[in-house]
Design a protein with these regions (language model features):
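Active-site acidic carboxylates
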Residues: 2-134
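Glycine-rich phosphate- or other oxyanion-binding loops that anchor nucleotides, phosphorylated ligands
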Residues: 133-146
Length: 146
C-alpha cells in the first residue's frame, strides 16, 4: 500500500489557482439580465437551500453570519417574483433522529423540532407559499436520503 505524503495544500494548488482566476473574472450580473438571458421568467427557477432555523437563529449550528442572509435573499427572491418568476424550491435540512450526519456535526435540524422550518421572514413571502418544499436527511438534496 502506498501512502501519499503530499500535503493537502500541495495537492489542491492547481484547483485553488483555477478557483482564484475564476472568481477574479466574474462579471457583475443583474436579475433582469439573468432573466433575459434565460428567455424570460419562465426559464428561471430560484432555489433556497438551508435557510432554516437550525442554521440561522437557533440550535447547535445556527450562526448570525447565515442569519444575516435571510433578508437579502428574501429581497432578491421577491424581486424575482415581481419580475414574473414562478418556479421556486425550498430545500431544508430535516433529519431523522438517527441521521448518519450527526456523527460529524452533532444533532441539528431534526424533523419536527422547528429547526427544520424555513425562516419565518421567508416563509410568509408570496413566492414561498407555493414553492416546491424538499426536506433532506443528507448534506445534499440530490443524494439518496440517508
Amino acid at each position: 500500500m502506498t501512502t501519499d505524503t503530499t500535503s493537502l495544500a500541495a495537492r489542491s494548488a492547481a484547483f485553488l489557482d483555477y478557483l482564484d482566476g475564476y472568481t477574479q473574472n466574474l462579471q457583475p450580473a443583474t436579475l433582469d439580465g439573468l432573466i433575459a438571458s434565460a428567455g424570460g421568467p419562465e426559464g428561471v427557477a430560484m432555489v433556497v437551500v438551508d435557510l432554516v432555523g437550525g442554521f440561522c437563529t437557533e440550535g447547535a449550528l445556527a450562526t448570525p453570519r447565515l442569519g444575516k442572509l435571510v433578508g437579502p435573499v428574501g429581497d432578491l427572491y421577491d424581486a424575482g417574483w415581481a419580475a414574473g418568476v414562478r418556479r421556486y424550491a425550498v430545500m431544508r435540512d430535516a433529519h431523522h433522529a438517527n441521521a448518519p450526519e450527526f456523527a460529524a456535526f452533532g444533532p441539528h435540524c431534526v424533523a419536527g423540532s422547528g429547526e427544520d422550518t424555513l425562516e419565518p421572514e421567508l416563509a410568509r413571502r408570496p413566492w414561498a407559499v407555493d414553492a416546491l418544499d424538499v426536506s433532506k436527511n443528507n448534506l445534499s438534496a440530490f443524494a439518496e436520503d440517508g
